[in-house]
Curated annotation (Swiss-Prot):
The lineage of its organism: Bacteria, Pseudomonadati, Pseudomonadota, Gammaproteobacteria, Pseudomonadales. GO terms for cellular component: plasma membrane; proton-transporting ATP synthase complex. Belongs to the ATPase epsilon chain family. It comes from Pseudomonas aeruginosa (strain ATCC 15692 / DSM 22644 / CIP 104116 / JCM 14847 / LMG 12228 / 1C / PRS 101 / PAO1). GO terms for molecular function: ATP binding; proton-transporting ATP synthase activity, rotational mechanism. Keywords: ATP synthesis, Cell inner membrane, Cell membrane, CF(1), Hydrogen ion transport, Ion transport, Membrane, Transport. F-type ATPases have 2 components, CF(1) - the catalytic core - and CF(0) - the membrane proton channel. CF(1) has five subunits: alpha(3), beta(3), gamma(1), delta(1), epsilon(1). CF(0) has three main subunits: a, b and c. This is ATP synthase epsilon chain. NCBIfam families: ATP_synt_epsi, PRK00571.1-4.
Length: 141
């Protein structure tokens, strides 16, 4: 029986996942993080992108998060995210369209242009698309 740690993923709307996992893989501020049982305590912000849970027995679940925080304690991993979507529920065509729209918005700068908001939309659309593509590559979906 594999060693596990309790993991909670909570969005602004609801608890998305609560259960035992062998590992959590997420995209932190300084790069990808692999959290396994016994990991040192940690708090970090999470960038938009995929978060992968390796559950007991090796089964995997992938979610898209739009950003948030990760807290690691000796017997618990908690993800507090702004928005969480099961990766399988993401629409690749819609993500590509959002990416194109965000790129176009960045090109059409006017006097009232909010660069940081446009850049944030671009980063989120790119992260959604990356999540869909990783899921397809990993699981042949």
């Amino acid at each position: 029986m594999a060693i596990t740690v309790h993991c909670d993923i909570v969005s602004a709307e609801a608890e998305i996942f609560s259960g035992l996992v062998e590992m959590v893989i997420a995209h932190g501020a300084l790069g990808d993080l692999g959290i396994a049982p016994g990991h040192a305590p940690l708090i970090t912000d999470l960038k938009p992108g995929p978060i992968r849970l390796v559950k007991q027995g090796g089964e995997q679940e992938v979610y898209y998060i739009s950003g948030g925080f990760l807290e690691v304690q000796p017997n618990m991993v908690k993800v507090l995210a702004d928005t969480v979507v099961r990766a399988g529920d993401l629409d690749e065509a819609a993500a590509q369209e959002a990416l194109k729209a965000a790129e176009k918005a960045l090109q059409g700068k006017g006097a009232e242009f909010d660069y940081s908001a446009a850049a944030a939309r671009l980063a989120e659309a790119a992260a959604q698309l990356r999540t869909v593509q990783q899921l397809r590559k990993k699981f042949g979906g």
